């Protein structure tokens, strides 16, 4: 039996939870500028499947790549790493 291929796992912040069973996660990464060598921050939003609607806006979550679940959803929620602090 062959081993399952490695899936991408990202940690990001939930920026929207208005959709049913779907969250929008903002993932920030750093890349080195090719000429000047300075670290530049890049951000990208991913839609992820949240089966039980447990993630809320501001939470830090871990998402994993999965089969296409809709036209835009390619990730699913693995765990809520840190709950948002409500002031």
From Swiss-Prot:
Protein name as catalogued = Small ribosomal subunit protein uS17
Question: Which Gene Ontology CC terms are recorded?
Answer: cytosolic small ribosomal subunit
Q: Which family does it belong to?
A: Belongs to the universal ribosomal protein uS17 family.
* Keyword field: Ribonucleoprotein, Ribosomal protein, RNA-binding, rRNA-binding
The protein's matches in Pfam families, at most eight in alphabetical order, are given as: Ribosomal_S17
Tell me the GO molecular function terms: rRNA binding; structural constituent of ribosome
Q: Assembly and interactions? A: Part of the 30S ribosomal subunit.
Leader sequence segment = none
Q: Which organism is it from?
A: Geobacillus thermodenitrificans (strain NG80-2)
Spell out the PANTHER family in the cross-references. 40S RIBOSOMAL PROTEIN S11 FAMILY MEMBER (PTHR10744), SMALL RIBOSOMAL SUBUNIT PROTEIN US17M (PTHR10744:SF1)
GO BP terms, alphabetized: translation
Q: Which Gene3D superfamilies match?
A: Nucleic acid-binding proteins
> Transmembrane ranges?
none
Entry function: One of the primary rRNA binding proteins, it binds specifically to the 5'-end of 16S ribosomal RNA.
PROSITE patterns per the record?
A: RIBOSOMAL_S17
Alphabetized InterPro entries for the sequence: NA-bd_OB-fold, Ribosomal_uS17, Ribosomal_uS17_bact/chlr, Ribosomal_uS17_CS
Which lineage is the organism of this entry classified under, starting from the top rank? Bacteria, Bacillati, Bacillota, Bacilli, Bacillales
Q: Name the gene for this chain.
A: rpsQ
């Amino acid at each position: 039996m062959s081993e399952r291929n490695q899936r991408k796992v990202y940690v990001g912040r939930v920026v929207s939870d208005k959709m049913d069973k779907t969250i929008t996660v903002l993932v920030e990464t750093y890349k080195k500028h090719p000429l000047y060598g300075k670290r530049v921050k890049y951000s990208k939003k991913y839609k992820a499947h949240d089966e039980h609607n447990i993630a809320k806006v501001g939470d830090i979550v871990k998402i994993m790549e999965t089969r296409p679940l809709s036209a835009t959803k390619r990730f699913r929620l693995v765990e809520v790493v840190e709950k948002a602090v409500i002031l």
